[in-house]
A protein has these predicted regions:
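Conserved AMP-binding A3 loop
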Residues: 1-21, 158
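Structural detector for helix-capping/boundary residues
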Residues: 13-14, 49, 175
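Hydrophobic transmembrane alpha-helices of multi-pass small-molecule transporters
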Residues: 18-22, 26, 150
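Glycine-rich, flexible loop segments associated with nucleotide phosphate handling
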Residues: 24-25, 35-47
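Conserved adenylate-forming
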Residues: 31-41, 59-179
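Conserved AMP-binding
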Residues: 42-53, 96
Length: 179
């Protein structure tokens, strides 16, 4: 994961491919209902995480088959340069990146984000007030938990409502949870 201690999780090819069906039509329907005015599919996706990280691997396996451009940024020091060169609608966002986007928004530097409007937040719980402020100002916030264990989003919170912004969310359709 991006915020906790490393953990060994056994994933099979079946685990890894099961989520691809979920990312197909269902995900496209979900994202289509949230597109900014004038935006059309396919979209483009930015990831800054290394290729060996599970979240990046999910992006590599999920978005190109749907026809999306996958923009890879290899170094945090090149983030703004790469985002400026490669328009990205959506970004897989570790907590530090979400805070960076929020700080740009607060400082009036949204133009640096080159049209980025959807943040797919993973791992740690973020400040719900910060997420709500982003959501109220045109950003779509997706909170995902359990990616390492499920090779997908695991538990999702797609709501943009204030009372649910701090909730973990609901299980994704492709996941079975056993305690």
């Amino acid at each position: 994961g991006t915020t906790g201690r490393s953990k060994g999780v056994m994933l099979s090819e079946r685990n890894m491919c099961a989520s691809l069906c979920t990312y197909g039509a269902r995900a496209e329907n979900w994202i289509t209902s949230r597109l900014p005015e004038g935006q059309k599919l396919p979209l483009s996706h930015m990831t800054l995480l290394p290729l060996f990280h599970m979240a990046c691997f999910v992006c590599v396996m999920s978005y190109p088959p749907a026809g999306w451009a996958l923009n890879l940024c290899s170094d945090i020091r090149d983030f703004y340069r790469d985002l400026g060169l490669m328009h990205s609608d959506i970004m897989a966002s570790a907590p530090m990146l979400v805070e960076t986007v929020y700080n740009d928004f607060k400082r009036g530097r949204v133009s640096r984000l080159n049209g980025l409007w959807d943040l797919c937040c993973s791992s740690a719980a973020l400040d719900p007030k910060m997420l709500l402020e982003l959501a109220q100002n045109g950003f779509v916030i997706n909170q995902c938990y359990g990616m390492t264990e499920t090779f997908g989003d695991g538990i999702l919170n797609f709501t943009q409502a204030e009372k649910h912004m701090s909730a973990v969310g609901k299980p994704d359709d492709h996941v079975q949870y056993k305690l």
